């Protein structure tokens, strides 16, 4: 199971709390997923009040507040400080977005905000791209976890750049890595784990599915399968065929 900032979590599935048809379905989906962490947006969910916060606490798993919707370092830092006070945790999923069309991370502001928040005692989980230089700068800024996107948030496209994600894993073998955003199908989640990633964070794929509870269970099984596959040392892909049946012992006719 993954370890983040010295804390071991019970599942490599990290699940968001937004967009569900109802609070009851959200809670049932969390139970079906056996998620290890619940992510919460202070800005997007703040209007739900104490009932929502009580529901999150009743899930009984660690909470990872995020700064979704922030477009500047100042916004992200202010939101982070409010989240730490409300949820009583130093953990923070840091999002600083360049524009609302792509929801692409603003990597320059992201690194700056990560440095400010790390210096203030936050344990930062940065939502970033798979760019090696950016990820290196985030580690230099104090981050001990990296959360590269698979594809744009909510797109459901899966892993747009498996090569880049594989390279990131190889370059930082000892850093906890989480594929965050873009997951649409259980096969996408399994692929991330097959690449050797420590966890997967998703939300829309479950919350907006026709049956969120069934999809949550499917994601849990896929992540388990991908993790087992990675640990089994799978064969390398090759361009040419390789016979699976040995010639030894075959009858010689004629």
UniProtKB/Swiss-Prot annotation:
The active site is at residue 93. It holds the Pfam family ThiG. InterPro entries: Aldolase_TIM, Thiazole_synthase_ThiG, ThiG. GO terms for molecular function: thiazole synthase activity. Pathway: Cofactor biosynthesis; thiamine diphosphate biosynthesis. It comes from the Bacteria. GO terms for cellular component: cytoplasm. 1-deoxy-D-xylulose 5-phosphate binds at residues 154, 181-182, 203-204. The keyword Transferase applies. It is found in: Cytoplasm. GO terms for biological process: thiamine diphosphate biosynthetic process. Keywords: Cytoplasm, Schiff base, Thiamine biosynthesis, Transferase. CDD domains: ThiG. It catalyses: [ThiS sulfur-carrier protein]-C-terminal-Gly-aminoethanethioate + 2-iminoacetate + 1-deoxy-D-xylulose 5-phosphate = [ThiS sulfur-carrier protein]-C-terminal Gly-Gly + 2-[(2R,5Z)-2-carboxy-4-methylthiazol-5(2H)-ylidene]ethyl phosphate + 2 H2O + H(+). The keyword Transferase applies. SUPFAM superfamilies: ThiG-like. Its EC number is 2.8.1.10. Belongs to the ThiG family. Catalyzes the rearrangement of 1-deoxy-D-xylulose 5-phosphate (DXP) to produce the thiazole phosphate moiety of thiamine. Sulfur is provided by the thiocarboxylate moiety of the carrier protein ThiS. In vitro, sulfur can be provided by H(2)S. Homotetramer. Forms heterodimers with either ThiH or ThiS. This is Thiazole synthase. It comes from Paracoccus denitrificans (strain Pd 1222). The gene is thiG.
């Amino acid at each position: 199971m993954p370890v983040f900032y010295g804390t071991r979590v019970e599942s490599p599935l990290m699940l968001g709390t937004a967009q569900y048809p109802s609070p009851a379905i959200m809670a049932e989906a969390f139970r079906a997923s056996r998620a290890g962490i619940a992510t919460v947006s202070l800005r997007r969910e703040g209007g739900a009040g104490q009932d929502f916060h009580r529901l999150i606490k009743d899930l009984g798993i660690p909470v990872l507040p995020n700064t979704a919707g922030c477009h500047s370092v100042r916004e992200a830092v202010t939101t982070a400080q409010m989240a730490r006070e409300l949820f009583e945790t130093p953990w923070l999923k840091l999002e600083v977005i360049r524009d609302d069309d792509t929801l692409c991370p603003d990597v320059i502001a992201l690194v700056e905000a990560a440095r400010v928040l790390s210096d203030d005692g936050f344990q930062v989980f940065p939502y970033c791209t798979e760019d090696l230089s950016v990820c290196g700068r985030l580690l230099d800024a104090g981050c001990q976890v990296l959360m590269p996107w698979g594809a744009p948030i909510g797109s459901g496209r899966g892993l747009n750049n498996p090569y880049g994600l594989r390279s990131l894993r190889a370059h930082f073998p000892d850093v906890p890595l989480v594929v965050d955003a873009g997951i649409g199908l259980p096969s996408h989640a399994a692929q991330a784990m097959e690449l050797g990633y420590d966890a997967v964070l998703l939300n829309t794929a479950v919350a907006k599915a026709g049956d969120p509870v069934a999809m949550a269970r499917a994601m849990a099984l896929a992540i388990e399968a991908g993790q087992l596959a990675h640990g089994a040392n799978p064969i390398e892909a090759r361009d040419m065929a390789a016979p699976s049946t040995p010639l030894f012992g075959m009858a010689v006719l004629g």
